[in-house]
Amino acid sequence: MKPIVRRGLGLLVIIIFSVIWMLSASMSRKDLRVRTCTGKETLDVIVKDSTERRFVEKEDIENWLEAEYRAYAGLRLDSVDLARIERIILGHSAVKTCQAWLTDDGSLHVELTQREPVLRFNEASNGYYSDADGFIFPLQSRFSVDVPVVEGAIPMSIPRGYKGEPATEQERVWLGQMLALTAHMNGGIWKTNIRHMNVEKSGNIILYPLEGKERFIFGAPVRIPEKFGLMEKYYTAVVPAVDAGKYSCVDLRYRGQLICR
C-alpha cells in the first residue's frame, strides 16, 4: 500500500472516531438533561467511620437536604448542585469530610467521615469537644464519646453551639497544650487511668486517676513528658515504700521533685 494511501486511511480513522466521540458526548449530555434525580427514595449514605462514632446517620442527611436544599427530587441530573449539597452537609459540626455524586439511575450518593473527639470540655451551661486538630464542636445529642473530660476554670470563651478554632491566639495555644497532654496520656500507660482533669482558677491542671485517692497537681500543661515521668516514679518508687493511701496530693510542678502530702 502506498504511503499516501496509508496516511489517508489513518486520517479517515481519526475522523470517524472523533465523530463517534462527539456524538456520544452529545447523547450523554442530552441523557443527563432527560434523566432526573430520584431523591431520598434512593438516597445512598455511606458514613465511613460509623462503627466508631454515630454522630451522623442517613436520617440526618435526609433532613438537612430537605430543610436546606429543598426539592432536589425530580431535578434533571445536570441541574443538581453537588457542590452545594456538600457545603450543606459540611456545615454541620460533626461532619469532617463529604463527597456527593450522582449515578445514571438518578440516585444521589453521599460519602462522609465524622470528626473524632479527643477531649471533652464541660462548663456550667456549655459542653463541647475538640478533635486532635484543635477544632471545637458541640456535644452531639445522639451519641457521646468516651474521652478525657476537662472541667473547672477553662481559659477559653466558647459560645454555645460554636464550631471552629478558638477565637484568640492565647486560647489556641492553651488548647494545643491540652491536646499535647492528652496525646501523651493516650500513647502510654495513662490512657485508661486518667479520664478527668480540673482547671483551677490559678491555671493549675489537676489530674484525677480512676484508681486511688491521689490527685496530681500538674500545673500548666507544659514539660509534659517530664511531669508524667515524675508521676510514674511516684507509683514505682514511693507507693511501694509507704502505707496504702498515705498521700492524697502529689505535686508534679517542680523539676526533678515529687512533693507528696
Predicted regions and their residues:
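Charged, solvent-exposed interaction patches on well-folded alpha/beta domains
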Residues: 1-49, 56-60, 65-91, 96-261
